[in-house]
Regions:
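Sequence-level preference for short, compositionally simple segments enriched
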Residues: 1-271
């Protein structure tokens, strides 16, 4: 086990001043488990984690004490004149197996989806991924559970870090997390199990947009979760809509607020 500590404004104790600096200093051998303790503070960083076998945990009393924050968004025009798009808007990109995030807040601060479009907080395309007691905050497309679907609807729609990667399904587990947004704020193709989580709608829209591949047994499973409203009117939101034809979403023993439309799900023009 190799342990590292990150603190705002690194001191003589050997702490790293940023997560990006800690990532660069991790042991090269991926078989060595690494734990990164992150001291309370706000870390304005856009992160990519490509090394397996890593645990990142906030050292504060609650997940709101340790915040990873960035504000990229889909409608932003890049230097080449092309919009940033959904999959380059992430705050934290994880593309490695056996990663655990614990007691952290990961947020995309871009804001209103009508103005800024898609803005991913956490882009998780990985196997045996765990988020424990985390807050994942955004508006549209807050949490992407990769992989991408096999084909995009329009050219350049998947532009981002895994657009050319093999579509390998991963298993993801979210426990005691708070996840918020408005439009399609939990989306993707992974097999993902949400247990004891609060799924908070900030406005009219859709909590999920699964793209479960054909033949995959499970998509999203919500167990003992609470679908809550934070500023969302009555019957103005749906549990989800299918991003692709074989989307699978299951709820077990969940509490559903009055903001959810009686139909539960929207068909997004699909049969």
């Amino acid at each position: 086990m190799y342990t590292m500590t990150v603190a705002p404004g690194a001191d003589a104790s050997g702490s790293f001043y940023s997560l990006k600096a800690a990532f660069a200093a991790m042991p090269e051998d991926p078989a060595v488990p690494v734990t990164i303790r992150v001291m309370p503070g706000i870390y304005h960083e856009k992160l990519s984690l490509m090394r397996p076998n890593v645990t990142i945990e906030g050292a504060g009393a609650s997940p709101s004490d340790t915040v990873i924050s960035f504000g990229d968004y889909g409608y932003e025009i890049m230097p080449d004149g092309i919009k940033r798009g959904t999959f380059r808007s992430y705050t934290f990109f994880v593309h490695a197996a056996d990663v655990t995030l614990r007691n952290l807040t990961i947020e995309n601060t871009a804001g209103d989806s009508k103005t800024h479009g898609q803005a991913i907080a956490l882009y998780a395309e990985c196997d045996r991924f765990v988020a424990e007691s985390c807050r994942i905050l955004g508006h549209q497309d807050t949490l992407f559970t990769g992989p991408l679907p096999p084909e995009e609807y329009e050219p350049g729609g998947f532009r981002g870090p895994t657009e050319s990667a093999p579509r390998i399904n991963g298993r993801q587990y979210y426990h005691n997390c708070y996840i918020c947004g408005d439009i399609d704020f939990i989306f993707g193709s992974a097999t993902a199990y949400f247990e004891g989580c609060t799924i908070a709608s900030l406005g009219p829209g859709y909590a999920t947009a699964a793209s479960t591949p054909e033949g995959q047994e499970y998509g999203y499973v919500f167990h003992n979760c609470r679908f809550a409203a934070e500023g969302c009117p009555q019957h103005a939101a749906y549990i989800g809509r299918p991003w692709r034809d074989y989307a699978r979403v299951v709820l077990m023993d969940c509490a559903i607020g009055a903001h959810i439309h009686p139909a539960g799900f929207h068909d997004w023009g699909k049969e």
